[in-house]
C-alpha cells in the first residue's frame, strides 16, 4: 500500500483472535491499536481533534497546540502537529514513564511536567493556564466531541465490518478520556444493540463502580479528584476523575456492566499474553484483556467478545511492568552459555589472539578528500 502522508495510516487496525488464553468455546478477539503509526489508539483522536479545529477555524495556521496527557495523546498530537506545522506543548504528571517524555521531545514537542501529587487534574489545569496565558489552542481531549466522534465513525465501524453478519456478544474497554467508550458504545447501540458494553476499571479505584457522582464546578466540569480514586498500576487508564465523555456514556446508559481488575493480575496477564500469544502491549491493554477474559467465563458458547488493546508495551519499559525483567543473564541463561566451551564471559581463551599485522591499504582519493572537507564540521563515523 502507498500513502501520501503518515496521517493516512491512522486507523484500520487488525482484529485478532486469541488462541490460547480464552476459555474453551468462547471467541476472544482483540483490537490491536498498537498498529497505528505512533503505536496507540490515541492517534485516531489526535488527528480528529486537530482537523476538527482546523475546519471550525479555532486553530489558526502556526498556532501552538497545548494538551494535558499521560503520554499517548501527546505522542499522537506530536505526530499530527509535526506533519501539519503546529508547535506543541504538553503537560504531563511526573509519574508517567520517561519513555513517553523522550518520545514527545524526539517528535519536537515541549514537555512541561507537573507534580505527581496533583494527579491528572493538576496537569489539566496547568495546560489550561498555559493556553490562557499564551493564547494557545487547547484540544481538551477529556471533553472534545471530536474524540468520541472519531471512534463512532472509525473504530466501531471497523469492528462491525470485520464481523459482518456474525453477532458481537460483548465489547470491553477501559476508559481514560472516555472517547473510545462513548464513541464505540453509541455506534454499537445503533448498529448492534444486542452487544453488551463492558467498562473495565482498577479494583482499588472504582470511580464508576462506586456509583458516587464526580465533584463538578459551576461550569459543570470535573473539579478535583473523584472521592473513590486511588493510585493504581495502569498508566493512562482510569484517571482520577470522571471525564465529560465518560459521564456522557454513563448518563446515556450505554454501559451494561463494570468489571473491576486487580493490578497484579493485569501485570501477570501481560507476561502471559506476550509469551503465549506473542502480543507486546501495555498495562492498559492487559488490564482490559483481563476484564474481557473474566467476562468470557460466563459468556455463552460461541460468543464473540472484543477487547480493546490501546497501545504498545514500549511505553512501559521503565515501569513496574518490566520490574522483574533482568538486564543481565539469568541463571538459566548463564547455564546455557556454559553448555558450550567458547564465547563465554568466564572462559579463558585457549590460545592468544593472533597479533594484528599492518597491511597496505589502497586509499580512495575521493573518499579521502570528502573526509578532509567535512571532518572539522560534521561527525564522521569510519568503519
Enumerate the predicted regions with their spans.
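Active-site/ligand-binding loops adjacent to catalytic centers
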Residues: 9-12, 124, 134-135, 190-283, ...
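Buried hydrophobic positions in well-ordered alpha/beta secondary-structure cores of metabolic enzymes
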Residues: 14, 30, 42, 65, ...
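Active-site/ligand-binding-proximal alpha/beta "capping" segment
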Residues: 134-178, 183-188, 247-260, 264-278
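Local sequence-structure signature of Cys/Sec-based thiol-disulfide redox active-site neighborhoods
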Residues: 369-383
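Positively charged, low-complexity intrinsically disordered leader regions
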Residues: 1-63, 337-338
